[in-house]
A protein has these predicted regions:
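Extracellular glycan-interacting surfaces
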Residues: 1-325
Length: 325
């Protein structure tokens, strides 16, 4: 079974789900984001506050700097459609790419040329904004979606040469965007302004929220075996979504066009936990959740959960969750 990596504000934890073993591995700078490599066993990518991008080839045990030092890295992903293609987002909002596993980097077309850019602003730091999330098309390496926090979800069909601005009715404050391999035109979004979904690659959007009793969504994942099963984490607002001790996070599950149902089997009622980070696993029904208590697993598409590992100390903030190949 694959190792699971959890990035906190100070370290990257490597968790063995077979026995719950947790090993912490420090980087030269504070982690900000995390991604597993879909092609190379044991390879992971981590962005940091000012130290740039780091790569691990031994399941998080050691990390090597691979570029973009001095930039504030806020998001990172490895393309599932092209080996060694890595996408990175920064604050202020820029997108960088490497086609050789971090040996060389180049910036895509500048995002601030988009008409909506004067309206972009991150509320805690209103004079700036950043790339919160990068989502790649499962089979088209040139197509991806970029979440600007806050103000826009933009896209490209040509690898960032031309960016397409946000569309009416779409999410404003996207935190995460999930795509299933078998439904590449279906986008599922967890946003600060609610839940959004599109079945035409983001041209049009809808917001089915029947059953959601809170409106601030942090994370989203799709059952690997069923593209119609979506889970999200949510809370009443940003502080209670992220900060242990004042948290009221919860997890919801939805099948097809049905209503949202809150996960209760193995998941505590609020106010017991932050809104967890979520990730799809490697087999049908397998989903993962990380909160301030530890790592949790579902084998039935999010209906029930069980704790796999508990951290040795409570982290203040979680920065990333990745299931290694």
């Amino acid at each position: 079974m694959s190792l699971i990596l959890v990035a906190t504000e100070s370290t990257v934890l490597a968790i063995d789900p077979r026995d719950g073993t947790v090993a912490g591995h420090d980087l030269p700078d504070r982690p900000t984001c995390l991604a597993a490599d879909p092609f190379v066993d044991g390879r992971a990518w981590c962005g940091t506050r000012r130290g740039g991008v780091f790569r691990s080839d031994d399941a998080g045990a050691s990390w090597q700097a691979v570029g973009l030092a001095g930039r504030d890295i806020t998001s990172i992903t490895a393309s599932p459609a092209q080996r060694d293609l890595i996408w990175v987002g920064t604050e202020p909002s820029e997108v960088w790419m490497s086609e050789n596993a971090g040996d060389d980097w180049r910036q895509t077309a500048r995002l601030e040329t988009l008409p909506s850019s004067p309206e972009w602003s991150f509320p805690p730091k209103p004079d700036t904004h950043h790339v919160r999330w990068i989502a790649c098309h499962p089979s088209d390496a040139q197509q991806l979606w970029i979440a600007i926090e806050a103000g826009a979800l933009v896209s490209t069909r040509d690898g960032g040469r031309i960016w397409r601005d946000r569309v009416d009715g779409g999410p404003w404050d996207t935190h995460e965007l999930a795509i299933h391999t078998n439904a590449p035109a279906s986008l599922r979004v967890a946003a600060g302004d609610g839940y959004f979904e599109s079945d035409d690659s983001g041209a049009t959007w809808r917001s089915p929220e029947d059953g959601l009793d809170v409106g601030y969504l942090r994370s989203v994942a799709i059952d690997p075996g069923r593209p119609d099963v979506v889970i999200v984490s949510a809370s009443t607002g940003p502080r209670s979504a992220y900060v242990a001790g004042v948290s009221d996070g919860r997890v919801y599950r939805r099948e097809g066009t049905g209503r949202w149902e809150r996960a209760r089997d193995g998941w505590p009622d609020p106010p017991r936990t932050i809104a967890p980070l979520l990730s799809a696993g490697r087999v049908a029904g397998e989903l993962w959740a990380a909160d301030e208590r530890g790592l949790h697993r579902s084998d039935d598409g999010g209906r029930s959960w069980r704790e796999i590992a508990r951290y040795t100390k409570t982290p203040n903030h979680l920065r990333g969750l990745s299931v290694l190949r």
